[in-house]
Amino acid sequence: MSKKYEGPSMMEELWEYVKMIVFVVVIVFIINNVLLINARIPSESMEKTIMTGDRVFGNRLAYMTKDPERFDIVIFKFPDDESQLFIKRVIGLPGETVTIKDGKVYINDSEEPLDDSFVAETPVGDFGPYKVPEGSYFMLGDNRNH
C-alpha cells in the first residue's frame, strides 16, 4: 500500500513565511541604514534643482573612497542639530577662503565668481571672507535668498 503525500504541515508553512518576512525586513533595514538615505525636502532652499516636498535618495557610501567635490549635492546632519537632515550644495572645500560679494561667490580671492547657473534667483548681500576649516565644507542652497 502506498503512502499518500500530505505536504508540509500548517506550522511548517507558517514558519517559512515568518522566515521570509524576517529576511525581507533585515534586507530593507540594511539598505535603509547602511546603503541609502531617504530624505524629504522640507523647504525651498534647493529650488529650482530640488523642489519642496520631493523625496531624494542618497548614497551613504559615496564618500567612503573619495572626498566631496565642489557642486556635489550632499545630504548631511547639521553639526548643531544632528536630528535634522540638510540637503545643500558643496561650495567651499577644506582650506579655501569663501567670499560672497553682491550675491556672487568667490574662492581664494579669485577675480572670477563660481558658476551660478543652478541658482534659483540672484542672491543679495555680502559674506566673508571665511576660511573653511580642514575637514569641513562650505555649503549653500541653490535658492540663496531662502
Annotate each language-model stretch with its function.
Residues S2-K19, I30, V34-R40, E47-H146:
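Soluble "head" domains of membrane/secretory-pathway proteins
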